[in-house]
Amino acid sequence: MKRTLIVVDVQNDFCEGGSLAVAGGADVAFGIAEVLKRWTDGEPWDRRYDYVVATRDHHIDPGGHFSDHPDYVDSWPPHCVAGTDGVAFHPNLDPQPFDAVFDKGEYQAAYSGFEGKSHDGVPLADWLRGHEVGSVDVVGIATDHCVRATALDAAHNGLETTVLLDLTAGVAMETTAAALEAMRAVGVRLQGEPIVR
């Protein structure tokens, strides 16, 4: 059984200074980069992961997902718009040794990385199956939105799923606590504590 690290939405617009910033996002990007450095520098026989993939919000025209008067539940300020700097991975996330990147939300709201497709059109679930992945660790932004949705979908797809909470940032205490409970309820393993400021 192969193991994969899924890096969720560590993008400029979700880090400090971005249009939908999550406090602690830049620190999470740096922490994930440290894991990626150890992975790329490690001996092939001593690597913790067989693959590392990333997801990105990549909005072209997501309809009602964007609003000038967002409710921050179903509608949000414009963010991660294709062709802008906001869609790029945060500079603290270096290196970026991704085996594949899965873009989501081009024309509709999308939270889970499992709603994304690689540049050659392969959905994340199919990519993982094709690479014989049975176990995933999930990290990224935000604990209470896209990390939660990705972890839940990973579990629903039969993957042994762990969220490395020290490498996640949540929007708010209340929604992060609810996300942790939802993930526990479907058997997702939780390690560490999320950043929530």
Could you say what each language-model-derived stretch is?
Residues 107, 142-145, 168-170:
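Short Gly/Pro-enriched loop/turn and capping motifs at secondary-structure junctions
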Residues 19, 76-77, 111-112, 137-138, ...:
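Short, contiguous strand/loop micro-motifs
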Residues 125-138, 151-172:
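Long, low-complexity, intrinsically disordered polar/charged segments
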Residues 29, 121-125, 148:
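Short, well-ordered alpha-helical scaffold segments within catalytic/effector domains
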Residues 35-36, 145-156:
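Histidine-anchored nucleotide/phosphate-binding helix
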Residues 61-64, 110-111, 147:
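Short catalytic/ligand-binding loop motif for oxyanion handling, primarily in non-cytosolic enzymes
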Residues 1-105, 160-163, 171-197:
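Active-site acidic carboxylates
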Residues 46, 83-84, 88-141:
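Internal catalytic-core helix/loop-beta-alpha segment
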